[in-house]
């Protein structure tokens, strides 16, 4: 039985609409997670949802080294357009290695390692995250059927094994630019992510991203 607890709840107005922010705590680790909820999610219809792992650099500092910030904004926008849904903000920074170690991994990437090689060089697995807590959060929220906004097959498999019915995978290919194309390529080739890239419709326009993405 899960030890995660629902400990706080309030309204949260955002640029994408008014959500209900729900706070969860896992006593064993003292780790806190939150979910943004919009509309009625307790009927029998599948719920549009996103499991979004924490990324300070992408979500708050607008880093172009990953696609995280773009995925966060797109997911919230799509949930708002649907009028109902859930975004779980999963507090596993840097694929579970933490912020400082992520910066160390970035330094190794500056020297030529890819995102997986950098983690391994620091003594970590390619992905240290545990998504099972997200299934517990869905259960506490009363969500049983999910249309999951993700490119990550591991999230889907973990939810299914934990009793959450994933009725559809909704692709989330956004935010590609010349700084993260190799990162996305690595996730697709080495981690099996369902990523469509080197495609003009997914490229972002910004002052620093005008160069053509190099062909592989």
Swiss-Prot record:
Gene3D superfamilies: GTP cyclohydrolase II. Its EC number is 3.5.4.25. GTP binds at residues 50-54, 71, 93-95, 115, 150, 155. Transmembrane segments: none annotated. Its cofactor is Zn(2+). One of its GO terms (cellular component) is cytosol. The keyword Metal-binding applies. The keyword Metal-binding applies. Zn(2+) binds at residues 55, 66, 68. Pfam families: GTP_cyclohydro2. The active site is at 127 (proton acceptor), 129 (nucleophile). One of its GO terms (biological process) is riboflavin biosynthetic process. GO terms for molecular function: GTP binding; GTP cyclohydrolase II activity; zinc ion binding. Catalyzes the conversion of GTP to 2,5-diamino-6-ribosylamino-4(3H)-pyrimidinone 5'-phosphate (DARP), formate and pyrophosphate. HAMAP family: RibA (MF_00179). Belongs to the GTP cyclohydrolase II family. This is GTP cyclohydrolase-2.
């Amino acid at each position: 039985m899960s030890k995660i607890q629902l400990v706080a709840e309030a309204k949260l107005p955002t640029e994408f609409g008014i959500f209900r922010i729900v706070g969860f705590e896992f006593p064993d680790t003292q780790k806190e997670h939150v979910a943004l909820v919009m509309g009625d999610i307790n009927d029998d219809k599948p719920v549009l949802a996103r499991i979004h792992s924490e990324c300070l650099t992408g979500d708050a500092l607008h880093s172009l080294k990953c696609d995280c910030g773009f995925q966060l904004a797109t997911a919230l926008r799509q949930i708002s357009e649907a009028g109902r849904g859930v975004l779980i903000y999963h507090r596993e920074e840097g694929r579970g290695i933490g912020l400082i170690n992520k910066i160390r991994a970035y330094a190794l990437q500056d020297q030529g390692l890819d995102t997986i090689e950098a983690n391994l060089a620091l003594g970590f697995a390619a992905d240290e995250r545990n998504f099972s807590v997200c299934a517990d959060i869905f259960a506490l929220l009363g969500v049983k059927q999910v249309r999951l906004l993700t490119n990550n097959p591991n999230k889907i498999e973990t939810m299914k094994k934990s009793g959450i019915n994933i009725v559809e995978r909704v692709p989330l290919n956004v935010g590609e630019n010349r700084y993260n194309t190799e990162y996305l390529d690595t996730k697709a080739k080495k981690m099996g992510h369902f990523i469509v890239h080197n495609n003009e419709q997914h490229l972002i326009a910004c002052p620093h991203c005008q160069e053509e993405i190099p062909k592989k």
